[in-house]
Structure formats: C-alpha cells, structure tokens
C-alpha cells in the first residue's frame, strides 16, 4: 500500500521584499532560529497542532492505518496580517537598492511609518553580497546600534528648550568653526564655520560647534540634568518590539563607565551614544505626531480564515515627550532644514510637496585615524511637512568615500523619492489597518 506523509512549508510570495522582517522559524533540534515576524509569532499564533491517527506496524519501518478516520484532526495555525503595504514596500526597496548601487555602499536601510498609528508600511534592509548585488540578510533597522550623528541634534534641541537653557534666538560664537573641550576639538563641516548664528540657523545648517556649546555650556556642572531629560523622553528604553533582535539604546549617565568630561559636547551631536534606526524614527514620528510617542507596529490582526481573532491597536509610549510650544518649534525647525536656502537639505525642497527632516553624516572608525574614517549618511523626517502622514528614515553605511558622502546627497534623495512616489501612488493607504 501507499502511505502519504504530507508536510506544509511556508513561502514568501513577495520575496525578496521585506524578507528579513517576514523572517522564518527553523527548528534543528539542538538549536532553534527565530527571525522576524514568523520567528516571533510561530509558537503562539502561526504554528498549528498535529493530528493523531492510530496505525499498526506491519514490518520494520512500515505502518498501516487501523482506521480511515483520525483520532485527532490536525488544526491549522492562525493567519498573521501585517501592516506592510506592498506598494510602499516595493517603492522603498527599489529606491534604496538603486542608490546603494549608485554609491557602492556597504549596506543601507529605509523604513516608512504611519504617523498616527505607528503602523510600519515598509521596511527594507539591504546588504552588499560578495558579487556586489544586494539582498536582505540582517534586520539593521531593528537590531543595529549606531551613533546617529546630527540626527540626534533634534533630541538635544528639545532637551535644551524644555530645560530653558536656550531659545531659538540664542546666539553662539564658536570661532573658526571649531569648539574646544579640554584638548579636543569639535569642527563644523563648513571650513571656517558660520560665525555668530542663532539656534534656529544652527539647526538648519547643522552646526556641530553650536550644539556642542549649547549642551556643554548649558549643562555645565549639571550633566545629569541633560541625561535625565533624555531619559524622561524614554530615549534610553527599547521599543519592546514583537520580534527578536532589538538592542537597547546606550545613553550613558554621568559616572557610568565611559563617561568623561567630553561626553556632553560629543553627545550633543550624536556621538558617545547608540540607538537603532527604528528608535530614532519613532522619536521623529513623535514630533510629527505633535509629541505623542507611539510604538512601531508590524501586525494589524490575527485571523482564522475571515474571522478576526485579535486586533493590534496603537500603543502609546509617552503621551507627550515635550511641551506643545517646544514641539511646534521643533516642527518649524525641521521644515526649515529643507525649506531655507541655507538648510542642509534644501536641495530636497519642493514647494508643491513640503517635507521636514534632519540630515546626518556620522563618522565611523574615527578612533583609528583620519585615513580610516568611513561615513554613515542618513535622513529622517516626515511628509507632508504641513500635515504629516508618514515618517521615514534612510540610513546608508559606508558610501564610496571617493563619491558623495553627506546625508543630503546620499540618503536625502532616497527619502524624497520614496515620499513623492508613496504620496502619488498610495493616497488612501490610511484605509488599510
């Protein structure tokens, strides 16, 4: 006779899109691999129950059913409905891939998030393979801790405004584009610096020296007050995602190992601290959401067939990360980065489609000397600037140093292209949970 042993395997119909986020579950007996949503939801949602049938051994290795009916029927697992929007995911993946190839970057990522609900509409993580092609092998958006560089100036800005250390008219006078802390110097990217500039302009031009002066002088003798303010905005806590791999941010407290007299000045513009790209995006999303800090959401609901078994609602991390006044100032200054002719992202300006955000160009391996320095280019913000619907972060690691390296040149165009294509082709995506 014939005994059929059937097995069910899971396929990724949109592979390679979001393949690392969709993930997999693999049980090899001695070790279990849990990646992405499948890894996180396999045991209690996706995994079904085996059935039972009474069989009789007729000879070694051969069995026959005793009855035609099962003593216990197998039960399929539930279906998981994600928040990913296939069109937005396709746009994000293809746009990021094109720019990574253009700048021969080591890797890059892009994430699109719904401002009001926290729903992740797209997530692409691409790494260069040995043959110079790109594929998803690691979820850097969730798991990669990095120094965010100038994109952290938003956090420093809000802290200083909330603690009334400055206002937007406060003037900074760093000479020759450099600021000295003990025997170390912080430099502006513009040779010779910007002269005397106020805080609003310093944010638009992304002056490292102005922000170092603002935080180092403003919190002199009270470094713990600066870190306490960051902690009050939940910046030191992980997001608590339903998939494995998220790293907790590293924001040192005065007295911790690694803290020094240089720490305030370096933290002011995104060094000596570590965050994941998704943690940075969630904070910017809070500014777009008028201060309401919400948890990124990957899953809309669990279903069995057409029946909804469970819905996943928006989770609030902090109802208001700052005062309404401070949030409004931050929104205006983020728009100025793009709108003002002197803003670092002005080349992304389009009067018909305003976007708001912040550029970042962080150095890596700077401890090894100038010849070993590489760069991480980033842009994070939201669109449209005047009525935010989506927030987005783009991070590109190690673009070719012989080509463009700045956030406005490498990551910024990815953001703008995603924003324009998403808004042109998916105007009603908010109807999808």
Segments from the language model and where they lie:
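A helicase ATPase "motif cassette" and its flanking acidic/Ser/Thr-rich regulatory loops
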Residues: 92, 202, 415
């Amino acid at each position: 006779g014939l005994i059929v042993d059937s097995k069910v395997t899971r396929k990724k119909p949109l592979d390679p899109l979001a393949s690392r986020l969709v993930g997999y579950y693999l049980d090899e007996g001695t070790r279990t691999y849990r990646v992405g949503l499948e890894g996180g939801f396999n045991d209690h949602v996706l995994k079904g129950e085996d059935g039972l049938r009474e069989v009789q051994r007729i000879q070694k290795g051969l069995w026959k059913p005793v009855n035609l009916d099962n003593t216990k029927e197998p039960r399929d697992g539930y279906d998981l409905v994600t928040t990913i929007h296939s069109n937005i995911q396709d746009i994000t993946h293809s746009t990021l891939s094109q720019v990574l190839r253009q700048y021969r970057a080591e890797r890059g990522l892009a994430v699109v998030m719904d401002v009001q609900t926290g729903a992740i509409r797209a997530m692409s993580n691409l790494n260069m393979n040995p043959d110079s092609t790109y594929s998803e092998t690691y979820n850097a958006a969730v798991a990669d801790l990095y120094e965010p560089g100038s994109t952290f100036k938003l956090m420093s800005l809000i802290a200083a405004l909330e603690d009334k250390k400055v206002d937007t008219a406060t003037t900074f006078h760093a000479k020759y584009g450099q600021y000295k802390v003990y025997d170390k110097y912080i430099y502006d990217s513009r040779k010779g610096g910007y002269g005397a500039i106020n805080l609003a302009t310093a944010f638009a031009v992304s002056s490292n020296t102005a922000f170092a002066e603002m935080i180092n002088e403003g919190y002199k003798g009270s470094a713990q007050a600066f870190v306490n303010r960051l902690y009050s905005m939940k910046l030191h806590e992980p997001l608590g995602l339903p998939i494995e791999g998220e790293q907790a941010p590293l924001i040192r407290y005065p007295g911790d190992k690694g803290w020094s007299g240089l720490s305030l000045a370096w933290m002011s513009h995104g060094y000596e601290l570590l965050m994941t790209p998704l943690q940075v995006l969630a904070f910017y999303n809070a500014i777009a959401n008028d201060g309401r800090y919400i948890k990124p959401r990957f899953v809309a609901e669990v279903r069995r067939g057409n029946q909804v078994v469970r819905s996943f609602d928006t989770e609030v991390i902090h109802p208001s990360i700052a005062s309404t006044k401070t949030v409004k100032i931050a929104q205006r200054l983020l728009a100025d980065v793009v709108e003002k002719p002197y803003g670092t992202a002005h080349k992304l300006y389009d009067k018909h489609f305003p976007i708001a955000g912040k550029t970042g160009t962080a150095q890596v391996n700077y401890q090894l000397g100038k010849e070993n320095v590489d760069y991480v280019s980033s842009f994070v913000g939201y669109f449209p600037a005047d009525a935010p619907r989506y927030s987005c972060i783009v991070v590109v690691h190690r673009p070719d140093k012989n080509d463009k390296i700045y956030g406005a040149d490498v990551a910024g165009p990815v953001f703008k292209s995603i924003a324009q294509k998403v808004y042109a082709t998916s105007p009603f995506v908010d109807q999808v949970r």
